[in-house]
């Protein structure tokens, strides 16, 4: 069975499904045909097993794997991701943030080769690092 290559399936594993997080993901992808598969997993399955389950159940060719602590700040993600794959059909995978050269094994140590935006919360304070304009 051929899957849909013009839409996106989002696969998320979480210990407890949070409807506000689900709504946030839905808003950021903001396309009526974006499929969001959120699996509640208290540790009985590995993350790989959950992602493989999502791959089997998804209806789209383009699949996004997300951790449940990832907060997206770019909206309208579905058409942006689809356009990126259309522009670069040779791509098999796209990363939102990372580095294109890794020598130490710690991605954050080689700042000149980093791209994207990474945010995190430490001791209740939000931190956002902008490494480049990124693809979105």
Give the location of each predicted region.
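N-proximal low-complexity "stem/linker" segments adjacent to membrane-targeting elements
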Residues: 1-28, 33-38
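Alpha-helical elements of Rossmann-like donor-binding domains used by nucleotide-donor carbohydrate transfer enzymes
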Residues: 20-27, 49, 53, 76-83
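Preference for well-ordered, secondary-structure-rich cores of eukaryotic proteins
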Residues: 40-41, 71
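Glycine-rich, basic loop-to-helix element that forms the pyrophosphate-binding segment
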Residues: 42-58
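Short aromatic/hydrophobic "clamp" motif used to bind/position activated sugar donors
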Residues: 63
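Active-site acidic Asp-centered loop
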Residues: 66-68
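Conserved donor NDP-sugar-binding/catalytic core segment of glycosyltransferases
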Residues: 71, 75-118
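Short, flexible, basic/aromatic active-site loop/helix in glycosyltransferases
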Residues: 113-136
């Amino acid at each position: 069975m051929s899957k849909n290559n013009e839409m996106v399936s989002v696969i998320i594993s979480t210990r407890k499904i949070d409807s506000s997080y689900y709504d946030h993901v839905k808003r950021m992808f903001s396309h009526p045909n974006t499929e969001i598969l959120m699996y509640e997993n208290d540790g009985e399955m590995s993350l790989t097993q959950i992602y493989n389950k999502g791959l089997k159940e998804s209806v789209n060719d383009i699949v996004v794997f997300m951790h449940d602590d990832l907060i997206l700040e770019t909206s309208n993600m579905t058409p942006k991701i689809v356009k990126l794959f259309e522009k670069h059909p040779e791509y098999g995978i796209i990363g939102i943030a990372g580095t294109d050269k890794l020598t130490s094994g710690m991605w954050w140590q080689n700042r000149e080769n980093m791209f994207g935006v990474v945010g995190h919360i430490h001791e209740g304070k939000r931190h956002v690092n902008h490494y480049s304009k990124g693809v979105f």
